[in-house]
């Protein structure tokens, strides 16, 4: 009835940003639709483990409420291998095919040069700086990994609709709403502005991959170096601090996680076969305490600061 022939019609045809040849456009569009199926498959894995996706329900302090079975893990392993094969066959080649048409994006969306990753996916050492995607930060664009101190984290409310001014550590701040109307020069948002020692920090896939690369993760080094080589800019890691670099980082991170998922599934299956079926270590809630959990969400660094008083 609308006259629109499909979901991708009536776009900005003729715009100079449309650089791909028609064959590559068709291929990328077909693969985009395939990607929706792969995304659903990944969500299905998370739902099996966590009851639903997103916001899974099986993680509790001390372990998990999910009881894995060999049948369930075999099904997960099959889906993991399907996803990993698709990443190798479609996702990686597509990005390398499209990227040469947009090399100018390596000079657009440049980062401020400050990057932070709390790290995610524990390895055997249980050290945050040795996670699959390790903890670390870089400052002022210098390719040197520093270890962040959570005590340096603050949240500013100068331009937020909350009581208070300036920046405070999460343990010290309050969240008392105070709506004063919209003013671009004063207060204009319900969002607080996190800072590290007063600095703005970029978080997300690019910082995570950069930390893995600089920490010496062999897979990250191989993939970053080969990507730069394929783009004709070997060794120029600083070009990743850009719009193009963020796209490349998403691909590299996806491949690292896809490989690790197969390894993790096999490890759990091995534990069950060896009789190691412990799921949960009970913990007594103290009368008073405070603590912080530092992790990663897909969008970037995530911190939860908690204070317990009277067991609450």
Where is each model-derived feature located?
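Active-site and channel-lining beta-strand-loop segments
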Residues: 292-312
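Active-site bordering "gate/hinge" segments
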Residues: 1-299
């Amino acid at each position: 009835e609308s006259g629109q022939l499909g979901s991708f019609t009536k776009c900005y045809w003729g715009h100079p940003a449309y650089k791909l040849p028609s064959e590559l456009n068709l291929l990328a569009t077909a693969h985009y639709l395939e990607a929706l199926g792969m995304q659903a498959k990944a969500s299905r894995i998370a739902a099996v483990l966590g009851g639903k996706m997103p916001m899974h329900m099986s993680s509790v302090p001390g372990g998990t409420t999910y009881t894995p079975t060999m049948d369930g893990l075999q099904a997960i392993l099959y889906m993991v291998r399907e996803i990993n094969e698709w990443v190798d066959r479609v996702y990686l080649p597509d990005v390398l095919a499209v990227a040469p048409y947009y090399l100018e994006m390596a000079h657009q969306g440049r980062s401020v040069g400050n990057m932070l990753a709390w790290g995610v996916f524990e390895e055997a050492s249980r050290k945050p700086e040795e996670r699959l995607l390790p903890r670390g930060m870089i400052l002022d664009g210098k390719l040197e990994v520093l270890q962040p101190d959570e005590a340096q984290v603050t949240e500013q409310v100068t331009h937020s609709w909350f009581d208070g001014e300036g920046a405070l550590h999460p343990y010290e701040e309050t969240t008392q709403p105070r709506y004063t109307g919209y003013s671009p020069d004063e207060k204009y948002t319900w969002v607080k502005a996190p800072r590290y020692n007063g600095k703005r920090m970029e978080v997300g896939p690019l910082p995570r991959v950069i930390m893995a690369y600089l920490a010496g993760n062999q897979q990250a080094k191989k993939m970053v170096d080969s990507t730069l080589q394929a783009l004709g800019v070997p060794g120029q890691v600083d070009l990743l601090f850009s719009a193009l670099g963020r796209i490349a980082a998403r691909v590299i991170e996806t491949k690292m996680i896809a490989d690790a998922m197969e390894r993790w599934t096999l490890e759990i299956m091995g534990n069950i076969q060896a009789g190691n079926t412990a799921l949960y270590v009970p913990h007594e809630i103290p009368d008073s305490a405070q603590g912080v959990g530092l992790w990663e969400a897909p969008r970037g660094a995530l911190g939860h600061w908690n204070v317990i008083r009277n067991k609450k």
